[in-house]
Amino acid sequence: IYDAVAGIRNETVLLEPGKVNFALYKKIDASNRIVEAMNPTSRMKAVKNPVEMENLRKAHLKDGVALTKFLCWMKKNAGKVELRETEAAERLEDYRKAQEGYLGPSFTTISAFGSNAAMCHYHATKEQESPVGTDGFYLVDSGGQYYEGTTDVTRTIAVGHVTDEMKEHFTLVMMGMLRLMNAKFLYGCRGLNVDYLARGPLWERGFDFNHGTGHGVGFLSAVHE
């Protein structure tokens, strides 16, 4: 891309400063006129059109079938047979592959048990992973690319015995999710304005989570958009 940009002459070049590094900027020839503005496709992608929304629902139905089968399998096997984090991720991938129109994962699956589940963007490998034990939380953060769109879903299940403190934290997070999911907000409201709905139950007890509440998802493209 650097050579391609360097070859542009006597043109008007749209530049989004927050998305272009300095090295690429320096490749723009002085004969060009630079216009600093947001990429016009960003706003178009930020709001899904009716066709995209309809197809995303179809993608999530397929993904939901795969995830439901996986969670059923996990509840039958986790804590009862020897099971490792990567094995669980592979099983989920098999369920997704069985869905018509599945193209592949939308990102590397986060399959984490116990303390690993508290690590943002943890990645288990065959060389470094943990067994899915008998007492604790198992978290799976995963998604798929389908012809109908892109998914990104996180679920947490209890394996074996969990403490009262763990139950409380789980319940508070669930309360926040339900509050945000069922909220009615006005046109023009930003994500920042409704963030408290998700964090409120935790804040009221003096807790918080050191992570974003959510993010945009592309349409058969980048899962973080």
Predicted features and spans:
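Active-site neighborhoods and metal-handling regions in enzymes and metal-associated proteins
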Residues: 1-225
